[in-house]
């Protein structure tokens, strides 16, 4: 959530910044107008409460002196009614103000490419050239089906579209990938966490998914009243429970930065994705992802973003997967992010790079919503900065391995770093499936 004081005192700057993220200036004008009325009413209410205290003392004095206090009592009643009306007005204005604030995205960083969509994204660097073959490479969904290690048909029968069974060596490969990711992340200084996979609304609001993105997730409902949500949502990413671990808490400065990592399932409705990536592992309703989260001091967050991005890159490099790093434009970056780097891995059958990680600096945006603060050496409280990044999306990593390491005979060579995690298996063949 943005700081209303920053918007109030820098209105033109705020309009210019948020215009690059699709926010109309009229929304900020309305917000500032509500804020001014709220502060005016709040000040008047506080003044009247002070007056009421004075009148109360006068009444007590008159009663002690056995004087008539009826006029003062009547005056206090009138003041009390006015205070009640003002406080009600302040509460309503506060609700309106928060309604707008909770739906405004983060301010983009000055270095972000400016543009309305991903066509304005800028390549920052590239690692290795795209994989070349002496034959026409197959798509990972065909490779997985032909090898008998991925089964979409039975998953569709059981769960519907955008689900998959991993079979035999497919399941082993998925497990090898996420165990490798977790091991490497812990070597890089992250503490592993196993978080809850169901979270409450306050947690979803803390990381910015609610109230704006309800349609993108799966929420649990009450069996006795299907129209009534239970205040529990299946997590769309481990970022939610990892960041909210620190919600409403004060961290001592000497504990920062904090680095945590977690494997979790991710559940997404993929609303608005009809017709996109209908085959394969790229866009699923349920998938596994290893997440990395950092909590740090404001003056450290930009350096921590670079470290976070390099941690994610390190995983792709050890797997030998070609990729490039892209700085997202103001119109393509996520709601909570001030700056985002996407890591896009090369997919030979699609002849293009596809996102496998997003590494974002959310500055104090999530910390303000979730009240994540730290106490400095002088005892003063400050909002922390939060960062998050995929390290990495497991299913997409499996897809990239199948496509980049495929052989002409239909087999897939296992990347060297994964062989120990695959019980020594160096090649996945048709005999690797189960059914």
From Swiss-Prot:
Catalytic reactions of this protein: tRNA(Ser) + L-serine + ATP = L-seryl-tRNA(Ser) + AMP + diphosphate + H(+); tRNA(Sec) + L-serine + ATP = L-seryl-tRNA(Sec) + AMP + diphosphate + H(+)
Q: Does the keyword Protein biosynthesis apply?
A: yes
Biological pathway: Aminoacyl-tRNA biosynthesis; selenocysteinyl-tRNA(Sec) biosynthesis; L-seryl-tRNA(Sec) from L-serine and tRNA(Sec): step 1/1
Q: What is its EC number?
A: 6.1.1.11
- This protein's UniProt keywords: Aminoacyl-tRNA synthetase, ATP-binding, Cytoplasm, Ligase, Nucleotide-binding, Protein biosynthesis
PROSITE patterns, sorted: AA_TRNA_LIGASE_II (PS50862)
- What is its subcellular localisation? Cytoplasm
In this chain, ATP is annotated as bound at 268-270, 355-358
From the UniProt entry, list the residue stretches annotated as the region Disordered: 42-70
Cellular component (GO) terms are: cytoplasm
Alphabetized GO MF terms: ATP binding; catalytic activity, acting on a protein; serine-tRNA ligase activity; transferase activity
Residues binding L-serine are: 237-239, 291, 390
Instruction: Answer whether the UniProt record assigns the keyword Coiled coil to this protein.
Output: no
Q: What is its main location?
A: cytoplasm
Q: Which domain of life is it from?
A: Bacteria
The protein's matches in InterPro entries, at most eight in alphabetical order, are given as: aa-tRNA-synt_IIb, aa-tRNA-synth_II, aa-tRNA-synth_II/BPL/LPL, Ser-tRNA-ligase_type_1, Ser-tRNA-synth_1_N, SerRS_1_N_sf, SerRS_core, tRNA-bd_arm
Q: Where is the composition biased (Basic and acidic residues)?
A: 42-69
Any single GO BP term: seryl-tRNA aminoacylation
- Function, please? Catalyzes the attachment of serine to tRNA(Ser). Is also able to aminoacylate tRNA(Sec) with serine, to form the misacylated tRNA L-seryl-tRNA(Sec), which will be further converted into selenocysteinyl-tRNA(Sec).
Q: How does it assemble?
A: Homodimer. The tRNA molecule binds across the dimer.
Stated family? Belongs to the class-II aminoacyl-tRNA synthetase family. Type-1 seryl-tRNA synthetase subfamily.
What does its UniProt record remark on the domains? Consists of two distinct domains, a catalytic core and a N-terminal extension that is involved in tRNA binding.
Q: What name does UniProt use for this protein?
A: Serine--tRNA ligase
Gene that specifies this protein: serS
């Amino acid at each position: 959530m943005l700081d209303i004081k920053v918007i109030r005192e820098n209105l033109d700057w705020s309009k210019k910044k948020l215009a690059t993220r699709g926010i109309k200036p009229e929304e900020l004008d309305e917000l500032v107008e509500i804020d001014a009325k709220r502060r005016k009413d709040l000040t008047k209410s506080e003044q009247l409460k002070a007056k009421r205290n004075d009148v109360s003392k006068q009444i007590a004095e008159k009663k002690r002196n056995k004087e008539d206090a009826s006029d003062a009592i009547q005056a206090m009643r009138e003041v009390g009614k006015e205070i009640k009306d003002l406080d009600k007005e302040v509460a309503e204005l506060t609700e309106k103000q928060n309604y707008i604030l909770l739906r405004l995205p983060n301010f983009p960083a000055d270095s972000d490419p400016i543009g309305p969509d991903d066509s304005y994204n800028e390549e920052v660097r590239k690692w290795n050239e795209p994989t070349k073959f002496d034959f026409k490479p197959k798509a990972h969904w065909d490779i997985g089906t032909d090898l008998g290690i991925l089964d979409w048909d039975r998953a569709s029968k059981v769960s519907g579209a955008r689900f998959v069974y991993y079979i035999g060596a497919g399941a082993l490969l998925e497990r090898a990938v996420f165990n490798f990711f977790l091991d490497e992340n812990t070597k890089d200084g992250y503490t592993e966490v196993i978080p809850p996979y169901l979270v409450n609304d306050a947690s979803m609001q803390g990381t910015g998914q609610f109230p704006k993105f309800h349609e993108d997730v799966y929420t649990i409902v009450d069996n006795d009243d299907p129209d009534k949500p239970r205040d529990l949502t299946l997590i769309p990413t481990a970022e939610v429970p990892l960041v909210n671990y620190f919600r409403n808490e004060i961290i001592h400065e000497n504990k920062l930065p904090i680095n945590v990592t977690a494997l979790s399932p991710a559940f997404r409705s993929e609303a608005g994705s009809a017709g996109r990536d209908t085959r394969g592992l790229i866009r699923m309703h349920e998938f596994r992802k290893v997440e990395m989260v950092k909590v740090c001091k404001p003056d450290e967050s930009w350096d921590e973003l670079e470290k976070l991005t390099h941690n994610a890159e390190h995983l792709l490099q050890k797997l030998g997967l070609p990729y490039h790093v892209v700085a997202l434009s103001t119109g393509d970056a996520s709601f909570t992010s001030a700056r985002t780097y996407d890591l896009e891995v090369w997919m030979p059958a699609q002849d293009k790079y596809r996102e496998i990680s997003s590494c974002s600096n959310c500055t104090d945006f999530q910390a303000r919503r979730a009240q994540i603060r730290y106490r400095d050496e002088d005892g003063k409280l400050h909002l922390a900065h939060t960062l998050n990044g995929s390290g990495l999306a497991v299913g997409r990593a499996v897809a990239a391995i199948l496509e980049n390491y495929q052989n002409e005979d239909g087999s897939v060579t296992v990347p060297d770093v994964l062989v120990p995690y695959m019980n020594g298996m160096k090649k996945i063949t048709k005999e690797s499936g189960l059914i």
